[in-house]
């Protein structure tokens, strides 16, 4: 290889940019995978829920009195809670949107999950507005119906992180 004749062109630079995944920002790929079949309206109640969620997102975007808002979607498995959250995250166009799913932590110890949760929230604080989707909280907490058993360490971390106000 003739090192003196190696040249990096703008095309090379642009190609490299396509390969880079930003540490911050809105990564819509994971959210898009959560709604492969799109969103289907399930009537008036569903539309009211979507409207309420969009209002909450807008409130966080424009209100100085609401630096943080926590919302829980509860329902049976397979009813579209994750898909709805993903659609709203994409639609929000917030500069920082992330999905935190137990799928990425198979076999990970509690300490790693807690550390990654804390880092996620710390990263979110660096953006003017952020949206974090905590998917499948029961699995994240390692909840088991029989017993019942769950990870108190992860629960305590979530309780602290979900209540802690962002720094000014």
Regions found by a protein language model. Give the residues of each.
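AAA+ P-loop ATPase motor domain of ring mechanoenzymes
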Residues: 1-143, 150-168
């Amino acid at each position: 290889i003739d090192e003196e004749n190696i040249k990096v062109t703008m095309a090379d630079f642009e190609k490299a940019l396509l390969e880079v995944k930003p540490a911050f920002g809105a990564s819509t790929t994971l959210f898009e995978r959560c709604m492969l079949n799109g969103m289907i309206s399930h009537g008036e109640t569903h539309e009211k829920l979507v409207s309420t969620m969009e209002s909450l997102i807008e409130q966080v975007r424009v209100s100085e009195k609401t630096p943080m808002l926590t919302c829980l979607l509860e329902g049976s498995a397979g009813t579209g809670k994750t898909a709805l959250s993903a659609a709203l995250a994409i639609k929000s166009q917030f500069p920082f949107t992330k999905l935190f799913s137990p799928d990425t932590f198979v076999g990970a110890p509690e300490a790693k999950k807690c550390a990654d949760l804390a880092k996620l929230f710390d990263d979110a604080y660096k953006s003017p507005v952020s949206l974090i989707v905590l998917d499948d909280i029961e699995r994240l907490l390692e909840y088991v119906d029989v017993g019942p058993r769950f990870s108190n360490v992860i629960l305590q971390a979530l309780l602290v992180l979900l209540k802690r106000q962002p720094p000014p």
